[in-house]
Design a protein with these regions (language model features):
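Helix-coil boundary/capping segments in enzymes
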Residues: 1-149
Length: 149
């Protein structure tokens, strides 16, 4: 029997790369602190306690093997949907994250599958991004936050 982790959130490498360069990422700002630090944005103060939020795909695979997990369904970590952004920035965030998830899946298709994030600021933009994510990137669906606005 295969073990599938359907609750496998990903904190985008593009976010960590921006923070390493002392830049904000789509309105999110990094503050050093215990664990992996704090990320503020969208009206929220998020404490990232686990070192796993910075895992590379290779580290994620090692962790999966150690836990006996065969497949992970990757989706954006919930604080980072970016619903607080304007339509254009929300669309850019979604596209960046979806491309990162798709690249991870392409590199390890037997171990990962992916769910898109959508720019819910605008319904037609969200529909277009879902279509792109599924038909062009090969993602399996989308994850939405419980609160869009």
């Amino acid at each position: 029997m295969r073990t599938i982790d359907i609750h496998a959130h990903l904190v985008p490498r593009s976010m960590w790369n921006a923070f390493d360069a002392k830049k904000d990422w789509y309105g999110f700002h990094f503050e050093p602190g215990p664990g992996a630090g704090y990320v503020n944005g969208g009206g929220a103060h998020n404490h990232l306690t686990s070192p796993k939020v910075k895992f590379t795909p290779e580290e994620r695979l090692k962790d999966m093997d150690a836990q006996g997990v065969d497949i992970q369904v990757l989706s954006i970590h919930t604080p980072f949907f970016g619903y607080h952004l304007d339509k254009k920035e929300g669309q850019a965030l979604a596209r960046d994250v979806n491309q990162e998830i798709a690249a991870t899946v392409r590199d390890n298709p037997k171990r990962f599958c992916g769910m898109a994030t959508l720019p819910m600021q605008d319904v037609s933009t969200a529909i277009a991004e879902l279509e792109h994510a599924v038909t062009k990137l090969g993602l399996k669906g989308a994850e939405l936050d419980t609160q869009v606005n």
